[in-house]
Amino acid sequence: MRILYHHRTASKDGQAVHIEEMIDALRCEGHVVQVVAPGALRTTDSAPVQKSHGQMGEDMGWVHRLKAHLPKAVYELMECAYSYVAYRKLVTTARAFKPDVIYERYNLFLLSGLMAKKRLGIPLLLEVNAPLVQERLHHSGGLTLRRLATWSEGVVWRGADRVLPVTHVMADFVRGRGVPE
């Protein structure tokens, strides 16, 4: 299967380890995986094609400084606006790569996978690791645009062809938001 794997993670942390392991596991199962993410575009054998700021593992301190100096609402709108940047990358890559499926690691305010699915008619598999609206409300300094965040989370979860929660607890939460199994 040809899989277009999309994520918005730039930092080299636990998320990055999970992402790299998922991509490696998919490839070990014989799938051809093309990654679309902040920073480097990657070939199907995982070698970077080009490096740019934002590649997983690079210093992302500028993002934290930006977040600290902007009003929360502005930063959250920027997160949402990034969906357009990611959407353009996804559509361009998908047209060249011709994937069977888009596999996206869910992130708050990230609408690009759903937008690409609707534009190109490619099924969207959505990996959900956490209820990010709740997480951001209670941790990470809070959430200003709660209604927008709740809407975007719901529309992406319900718009995916399959939602892949990583735990039974997360699956119960996703079902509670009206996402069919």
PLM region spans:
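Helix-loop-beta element that forms the nucleotide-linked donor phosphate-binding surface
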Residues: 171-181
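Glycine-rich phosphate-binding loop signature in dinucleotide/nucleotide-binding domains
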Residues: 93-98
